[in-house]
Amino acid sequence: MTYNSYYCRGNTGTPAVSQTNTENFARVIKTLDADIVAIQELDKGALNRNKRDLLQEIADATGIDYQVVFAPAADYMGGKIGPGVLVKRSLGVKSTKTVELPGDEGRMLVVVETEGFVFLGTHLDLNDEARRQSATIINDVSNGYRKPVFLAGDLNDSHRWSGGGAAFPVLTNEFAIKSSTEGTLPGQPNETIDYILFDDNGQPSAVNFLETGVVKKLNFNGKVEDLDTVSDHFPVYLDIELK
């Protein structure tokens, strides 16, 4: 799964940092029961945000036993901002690392290796050339493994853009789009920039793909609620089965 948190400020027209907004974001992850999720727009130690560790706060609010992997990509108000990954400890995490990516802002790639697959989480830059270069780096990282690799994140790029975008012509040399592309931004219903991609690394039969979706409504305790006020992005999930 991939989900841009919008720094858990809420998408109500008056963004504000609050515990309630963090809990609202976390309950989406809890309700979907994501095994592993790439999250973008996280902060840690920022003076104007009570020095919170947002990824840890999200993990705690889900009540799920997640391992937390944060990638400090750029300085922000005495702390750091960047992407991160929550991964259930039950998946059997073998290793984690971060890889620096180019950009006008600091950018990072989170790498989580489990027994059965590798998961890459990121938030690519707005600069076209930086995204192209990042795509090459990501392909190289994927090629370093002998097991299936998933790439999830806010790619700030779309396969539907002119020329196929900046990153996708490079990424699709290794990866295939496996997530739903029905529109991932509440404010731009036809725009898709949040993706989950797959590189089989020569093992095309290692994974069964069961279901995918962009979640725009969710049932919380019997009540269906719109998710367009939780964040300025919708969560995107991919349900798989390892063979």
Language model features: what each stretch is:
Residues 1-61, 75-77, 232, 239-243:
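N-terminal, active-site-proximal structural segment of metallo-dependent hydrolase catalytic domains
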Residues 32-36, 63-67, 115-118, 145-149:
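Loop/turn elements at helix/coil->beta-strand transitions in domains of secreted/extracellular proteins
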Residues 4-6, 42-43, 123-125, 155-158, ...:
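Catalytic metal-binding/acid-base residues of hydrolase active sites
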Residues 1-12, 95-97, 111-125:
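Active-site-proximal beta-strand elements of phosphoester/diester hydrolases
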Residues 37-40, 69-72, 150-154, 178-181:
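Active-site neighborhood of phospho(di)ester-bond hydrolases with catalytic His/Asp-centered motifs
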Residues 42-117, 210-216:
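Structured beta-strand-rich core segments of catalytic domains in phosphoester-bond hydrolases
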Residues 20, 24-27, 31, 53, ...:
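Extracytoplasmic/secreted proteins, especially bacterial periplasmic and envelope-associated proteins
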Residues 96-98, 128, 140-150, 157-243:
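Metal-dependent phosphoester-hydrolase catalytic domains
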